[in-house]
A protein has these predicted regions:
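Extracellular glycan-modifying ectodomains
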Residues: 1-465
Length: 465
């Protein structure tokens, strides 16, 4: 009898283990889970007729995302881990209390960990200044704004094991302090959003709801001084139809819909592009009853902003491309307004992937003195736009003031450089026109730094292409 029971138990276990594989015959998982991309079955033979020697590896990857009942199993596992251990089954999501979910990439900001250094914050300000000056020189008013992380505004539902903060210093505060007196147009969204008694972000999504987006939109439009409909008199529709991005990642088969608010803004404009959703990388709109032309960089927080801004401008262009090709977009769209929105957790992008702009040629106010140190240069075709040659590098062997600025002398012409954060430390970057400065050409490059108000030429250097 015991042997029969053991045999039945083994057979049951084998059957359970075979369900995901055999189930693919009748019910494979065809839709991606969360932010994953749709899995495609590999081919044993490549298009050129040669054998695909990576076929088995690719087949394994395909199976991992396509076995039967995968979403249901992920959802069940997530429910157990959240309910019993108050932890997340997905590395990119933090499971909080009362069914709240947070984006893991916001943890550093929440804890005050890995905060940008003073020189890095100054680099962000420096790069914003370059963007604003270029924008204004090409007829577009510039404004920068930051969308708060969800756990910045609503920390009470973060799990207990995030209770020990590393520091009370946060990038948002450092940025706001550094912006003071710079002349850079900045719209603060932290104060108005944090002053609201109502929760304006979704529980199971990392973003604000439409009511929060409307508040942000009105703050930006007021900062621009542009007349607009604030939707205070709009007939608002409340629908329980929104399933959050984090919810889809953690509970692909148990996503709970949340209430969202609709103000009718989406009926005031039409799409110029073949737009499938507000998630699209590039969206262009027209509203014949509005005036002005808007160019807006937005991340995923901008999804809910698109209807409001599209309704307020005659022509609007919304891009998610990063690094954004500001020069090409301004030349093509000729906007009168350029709004740049970044979420708090991505402030550092401004010094890791600054926008594509041709470096401004400049004249130094004094002849630079010599300064020791070693500059390492890299010259290469730009990875994102063929019209540019990228000249980047780092400086070592010398200590600079946290507000130091970089300039590159290339073939005896001086260009203002972006501040750049690299794995090797603080650095610099310029984009030069590739027709005048081809990457394969021998370029005479010198690094000049402005340190404590004085200009210095770095005497040591090496060149790599």
């Amino acid at each position: 009898m015991k042997k029969i029971i053991c045999g039945l138990f083994v057979a049951f276990c084998v059957a359970v283990c075979l369900i995901p594989s055999l189930g693919m015959i009748v019910r494979p998982t065809t839709e991606p889970v969360g932010n994953e991309r749709r899995a495609k079955a590999p081919d044993a033979v490549k298009k050129d007729g040669s054998p695909n020697f990576s076929y088995l590896t690719e087949l394994g990857g395909y199976y991992e995302k396509s076995f039967a009942f995968r979403p249901e199993m992920i959802t069940a596992d997530a429910a157990v881990q959240a309910g019993v251990f108050q932890s997340s089954s997905v590395d990119t999501v933090i499971t909080g209390t009362d069914s709240w979910l947070y984006y893991t990439s916001s943890a550093d900001d929440y804890l005050g960990r890995n905060t940008l250094s003073e020189s890095e914050i100054n680099g962000v300000i420096h790069n914003l200044g370059i963007i604003q000056r270029y924008s204004q020189a090409h007829g577009a008013r510039f404004l920068f704004t930051v969308a708060p992380n969800k756990n910045t505004l609503y920390p009470d539902h973060m799990p207990y094991y995030y209770g020990l903060r590393v520091s009370d210093v946060h990038n948002r505060d450092l940025l706001r302090q550094a912006l003071a007196g710079t002349g850079i147009a900045y719209c603060d969204l932290f104060a108005p959003l944090s002053s609201q008694s109502e929760t304006l972000y979704f529980r199971r999504d990392s973003h604000w709801n439409n009511k929060g987006a409307l508040l942000a939109y009105n703050e930006v439009m007021n900062a621009l001084g542009k007349e607009h409909d604030d939707y205070s008199a709009a007939e608002v529709t409340r629908k329980k139809d929104f399933v959050g991005d984090l919810s889809k990642m953690v509970y692909p088969r148990g996503g709970e819909a949340e209430y969202n608010y609709y103000y009718g803004a989406e009926n005031a404009y039409g799409y110029v592009t073949d737009t499938q959703s507000v998630e699209d990388t590039l969206i262009k709109t027209q509203n014949p009853n509005a005036a002005g032309t808007l160019y807006m960089y937005r991340d995923s927080f901008g999804n809910a902003l698109v209807p409001f801004f599209a309704s307020a401008y005659g022509n609007a262009s919304f891009t998610k491309a990063f690094p954004m090709n500001v020069a090409a977009d301004l030349a093509a769209d000729k906007p009168d307004t350029f709004v740049m929105e970044l979420v708090e957790r991505n402030i550092g992008w401004l010094i890791t992937m600054p926008p594509l702009l041709p470096a401004a040629e400049t004249t130094l106010f004094q002849a630079p003195s010599a300064l020791g140190g070693k500059a390492e240069f890299t010259v290469a075709p730009c990875d994102y736009a063929a019209e540019y040659t990228a000249v980047s590098g780092t400086l070592s062997g010398v200590t600079l003031d946290s507000g130091a600025e970089y300039y590159l002398s290339v073939n005896d012409k001086v260009y203002e450089a972006y501040s750049l954060k690299t794995e090797g430390g603080d650095g610099f970057l310029v984009y030069l026109p590739s027709d005048a400065y081809p990457a394969e050409a021998a370029l005479d490059i010198k690094l000049i730094v402005k340190n404590n108000g004085e200009y210095y030429e770095i005497t040591g250097g090496s060149y790599e292409d």
